[in-house]
Amino acid sequence: MSLRLVSPIKAFADGIVAVAIAVVLMFGLANTPRAVAADERLQFTATTLSGAPFDGASLQGKPAVLWFWTPWCPFCNAEAPSLSQVAAANPAVTFVGIATRADVGAMQSFVSKYNLNFTNLNDADGVIWARYNVPWQPAFVFYRADGTSTFVNNPTAAMSQDELSGRVAALTS
């Protein structure tokens, strides 16, 4: 029976290799992209005011603003010009208006009046509003790319352009 002794140099080299492998694995795994948290509320389909299909899941993993509005709401009318400007100034953020409680003609007139050059959906039956538990208009959901969101609903005042701009800027910072 022969006894084999490991030299101190070989043991040291093996230790260095083990540490190097651990460091590579640790930093390699730390930099692995994380999956975006799925928001079940985005699992809806709808029709835009121009009649095109829309899939809510297309917003997953992107900064986005959902704006719940009606054409007869005074606060929605007050917010619309700001939304038009803030959306135009933030092309990295997807804006989607979700209109209800009116006929399509009134919705389309509202979009035209305020030059809302972003997607607006016809939610005449209120299904999307119900998914988000929106009790009244106007309301917003601000989505960050990681899937987290903030719901804002103030039935007593329109959101100021400064507040809207700040909330939108935070989605991409």
Curated annotation (Swiss-Prot):
GO BP terms in the entry: cell redox homeostasis
Signal sequence annotation: 1-38
Compartments in which it is found: Secreted
Domain of life of the native organism: Bacteria
Family note: Belongs to the thioredoxin family.
SUPFAM superfamilies documented for this protein: Thioredoxin-like (SSF52833)
Keywords for this protein: Disulfide bond, Redox-active center, Secreted, Signal
Role description: Disulfide oxidoreductase that catalyzes the oxidation of reduced, unfolded secreted proteins to form disulfide bonds. Despite a weak homology to thioredoxin this cannot serve as a substrate for thioredoxin reductase.
Protein known as: Soluble secreted antigen MPT53
Gene Ontology cellular component list: extracellular region
Pfam families reported in the protein's UniProt record: AhpC-TSA
Disulfide links within the chain: 73-76
A GO term for molecular function: antioxidant activity
